[in-house]
C-alpha cells in the first residue's frame, strides 16, 4: 500500500528501475540499522548496570579485602573499653613532664590551659583533652588526627 502511494505521488513518469523503489528501500535500511544500533546500546547499558551491581555487591560483602584487612576495619569501627583507655598516658599541660607540641585539642578546638590534664596517644603523640578523647575512643579505636590504629599498640604492649 505504501509503495502504491509512493508510485502514485511520483506522477507515474518514472521507470521502475530509476529509483522509485530505491527511496523506500533506503528508508527501510535506515530504520533497520537504527533498530540494531538502539538494541546494541540498550544491551551495553544493561550489561554495564549489571557489572556495576555485581562489583558493588562484591565490595559490600568484602570479597575485595583480605581476611586480616577485613578484621582490621571491623576492629577500627569498634571502640575501646574504659579499662583500655586508662592505659594511655595522661600528662599535665604546661608542667614540662611530657613535651606536648599541640596547643589545642583537635576534637573540640579548645586551647589547652596550664595544669589541664591531657591524654597523649602513644603511637603518634597527639594530645587531646581527656574528656574529648575518651568520648572519641569509646566509639572509635583510632587517633582522630592521623587515624593510626590504637588496637595494635595494646596488643603489642600487653605481651
From Swiss-Prot:
Mention one GO molecular function. transferase activity
GO BP term (any one): protein ubiquitination
Its membrane topology is listed as:
Single-pass membrane protein
Localization = Membrane
Entry keywords, A to Z: Membrane, Metal-binding, Transferase, Transmembrane, Transmembrane helix, Ubl conjugation pathway, Zinc, Zinc-finger
Matching entries from InterPro entries are given as: ATL10/ATL72-79-like, Znf_RING, Znf_RING/FYVE/PHD
Q: Which reaction does it catalyse?
A: S-ubiquitinyl-[E2 ubiquitin-conjugating enzyme]-L-cysteine + [acceptor protein]-L-lysine = [E2 ubiquitin-conjugating enzyme]-L-cysteine + N(6)-ubiquitinyl-[acceptor protein]-L-lysine
Q: Which domain of life is it from?
A: Eukaryota
Q: Per its UniProt record, what Pfam families does this chain match? A: zf-RING_2
Q: Between which residues do disulfide bridges form? A: none
Q: What is its EC number?
A: 2.3.2.27
Tell me which GO cellular component terms the UniProt record holds. membrane
Q: Which Gene3D superfamilies match?
A: Zinc/RING finger domain, C3HC4 (zinc finger) (3.30.40.10)
Q: Which family does it belong to?
A: Belongs to the RING-type zinc finger family. ATL subfamily.
* Annotated protein name in UniProt: RING-H2 finger protein ATL74
Gene source species = Arabidopsis thaliana
Taxonomic path:
Eukaryota, Viridiplantae, Streptophyta, Embryophyta, Tracheophyta
